[in-house]
Amino acid sequence: MTLNGGSGAGGSRSAGRERDRRRGSTPWGPAPPLHRRSMPVDERDLQAALTPGSLAATAAGTRTQGQRLDWPEGSSDSLSSGDSGSEDGVYKVHAAGAPGVGKSALARIFGGVEDGPEAEAAGHTYDRSITVDGEEASLMVYDIWEQDGGCWLPGHCMAMGDAYVIVYSITDKGSFEKASELRVQLRARRQTDVPIILVGNKSDLVRSREVSVDEGRACAEVFDCKFIETSAALHHNVQALFEGVVRQIRLRRDSKEDNARRQAGTRRRESLGKKAKLFLGRIVARNSRKMAFLAKSKSCHDLSVL
């Protein structure tokens, strides 16, 4: 990753030395200055803040001014769009999942604030401009799923957003089942083909694993979404996750054949309710290892294709 900045020959030489020094390290590096927004925690304040149109106005506010983040050029190609994006030019992404699965950690890594007082002061939304496949995109990640401790906010979150990241912990089978339930609820609320990515976090805890990779892929196949495993602790696949979010949004908005594909898929698919009952019944069975053979892969792990 390189940061665009500096001026004149001195700035170029400094930037070159900085790139050489980082070349063998994590591609994320220090984040540029961020525009952070704290979300209210009282339900009445939330309702006032998230009334129709106000959230879009918030997202359209002043974003990072200063250095622009360029991610590595080696990312895989996908369809790209020059002007594609939400109406205000910002892709809104919601992180959802059971408590303790690491969705806040993933959001903070994306936002560039992880530890110390800065993380506490960052609030619950993170916006950042990233370059994916040679084109810049602005993402706003909302980590507000559990703030009010009730059902109003998750319901509201399901009604808006350009993409959803549903996170579970590979060390907690219960969080995996919760992620499956959220997927069903989300599709029932959002009839449009909004991108949904199932994320198995904490992949570094190999000895404590309760959910296999095959189970995660099978779940994504059954519920028609994408799948990726990450480790917030090691920063593994976090960049790939958010780049994949951008690609999935672009692919759906740029594809001329999307409507025909969706209509054909609707005729083939069973009802989500039946699928949910069938799947949840299988994952509690002792022979859950056989789940990998129940569905053929359709590249659910490849976030650069539909």
Swiss-Prot record:
Residues 1-13 have a biased composition (Gly residues). PROSITE patterns: RAS. GTP binds at residues 97-104, 201-204. It is found in: Cell membrane. Residues 276-295 are annotated as: Calmodulin-binding. Interacts with Calmodulin preferentially in the inactive, GDP-bound form. Interacts with CAMK2D. Interacts with CACNB2; interaction may be involved in beta-adrenergic regulation of heart rate and contractile force. Interaction with CACNB2 regulates the trafficking of CACNA1C to the cell membrane. This is GTP-binding protein RAD. It comes from Rattus norvegicus (Rat).
